[in-house]
Amino acid sequence: MQTPEERYIQAHSTAQGAALEWIEKQTNIRTNYPRMLSGAVQGRFLTMMTQISGARNILEIGTFTGYSAACLAMGLTSPDGHVDTIEVNDELEDLIREGWSKAGVSDKITLRIGNAMNILKELPGPFDLVFIDANKREYSEYYELIIDKIPSGGPSPAGLRGRPYRPAVSDRCSVFRDVPPGPGYLPPP
């Protein structure tokens, strides 16, 4: 069920397109938790953040079925722009890659399958934009592993879909509330 704000945004912005609709439909058909999909409104926001920031190197933690990574890649304005994305569930890889192929962004995204904590230790950075939408219990640990890889003032939206108001999630995400404001930084609620 959409909120009034989501209905307004959808009514006043461009459609998500056939490839993203395909990813959304396949997510609903082929996964147990389709509500984890970023969706059209958040996807449009991510595309816009990428375009406005001019980000060239993007990191996404939590790929799920590839919808948000596709949106980030679609927003790249530089021909050499790239998205690195991390997903722990290897069973989603075929769906992810098929969706990116349909969206025409496969060559702009590197999918890394495995534990984000281990992968983040190896990724050199820097990243102009980081989107975190993975295991909420590990947000503060992700933050500690990426903070030195983000230039000062780089945007870092943290995805809090689901129930961010739950104390356990809210407490673990409090590290983001203490980040000094910078251009494009969107703190969690």
Model-derived features: positions:
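A short alpha-helical cap/connector motif
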Residues: M1-F131, K136-P157, G162-P189
